Amino acid sequence: MTKQDQRAERHIPVLLQPVLAGLMPLVGAKVIDGTFGAGGYTRALLKAGAQVIALDRDPHAIAAGQSLVDEFFPRLRLVHMEFSQLDRVVEEKVDAVILDIGVSSMQLDEAERGFSFQKDGPLDMRMAQTGFSASDVVNHLKAKDLARIFKILGEERYAGRIARMIEKRRAVQPFLRTGDLAYAIEALVGRKPGDRIHPATRVFQALRIYVNDEIGELARGLFAAERVLKAGGRLGVVSFHSLEDRMVKRFFVSRSGEGMRSRHLPEIKHSPATFFPLFKGGITANKEELQQNPRSRSARLRMGVRTNAEALAEDMKLFGLAEIASFEGGKK
């Protein structure tokens, strides 16, 4: 058994029981797991008798999942693809889609991937291992653009100070390691005894989201799921921070037939409902799960049931997102 297989065996998927209860996978049901990761949801769905198409853009996850393909052949199909393209892998409507947004435990545990400052490694953070890295971003974007990334994607209160520090320090020595960046941020911001959250947490979150275009990926994935679900099909989304959760909430509200009501956004005209919520406010982990799996602390599950109405047009404006500079100098 490889190290990746061992990590997958130890992986505990968050909110698994609420996910299964909500999706209600019947024997033979066709389900898309858009974020395969360590395969926790996929394995549970297969054990329930479902047929699963599992996607992941991380080649390491695909390689680690081959043993699961062999175990459940022919009911599991594993595809190296971003979940925003999930409507490209099916020709018929499906019964359910599940998305577990963000970084996986396996990615966090591998120091060489550069997702976490808990273990020193290269400042990388690329899920697909292609394109620009977090080091590229930190060492080349202007301070004002870094500040917007930290503020918008990480909700970091010291975004400006941290960005200016980075710009000044990199002129002398570039940031190449996760530990180096985390230490520099902690030295600038400080850390009080007993602080539960490391001062670099939000900056690392923002960089990861930016490098992997996770916000754009989530938006496109929600629209794609709307197109592939049959009437009565269920869409479940597990998110781990408020920015993602607000996007998911806005999506379901905009698809409820009631339109969006916000003084900050243009009002969306009423359209036929394409989803109705399965439960109000989302589901979070109970005390038992929190004790068994601390990672579930920030997880929230929202779920909707597809109606027979036609899928609505994609409209990024409904998410109310601010623009940030792209690495190439345009807009992301």
Swiss-Prot record:
It catalyses: cytidine(1402) in 16S rRNA + S-adenosyl-L-methionine = N(4)-methylcytidine(1402) in 16S rRNA + S-adenosyl-L-homocysteine + H(+). Its main location: cytoplasm. Gene3D superfamilies: Putative methyltransferase TM0872, insert domain, Vaccinia Virus protein VP39. It is found in: Cytoplasm. InterPro entries: RsmH, SAM-dep_MeTrfase_MraW_recog, SAM-dependent_MTases_sf. GO terms for molecular function: rRNA (cytosine-N4-)-methyltransferase activity. Disulfide bonds: none annotated. Specifically methylates the N4 position of cytidine in position 1402 (C1402) of 16S rRNA. Belongs to the methyltransferase superfamily. RsmH family. It comes from the Bacteria. This is Ribosomal RNA small subunit methyltransferase H. It is an enzyme of class 2 (transferase). One of its GO terms (biological process) is rRNA base methylation. Keywords: Cytoplasm, Methyltransferase, rRNA processing, S-adenosyl-L-methionine, Transferase. Its EC number is 2.1.1.199. GO terms for cellular component: cytoplasm. S-adenosyl-L-methionine binds at residues 39-41, 56, 83, 100, 107.
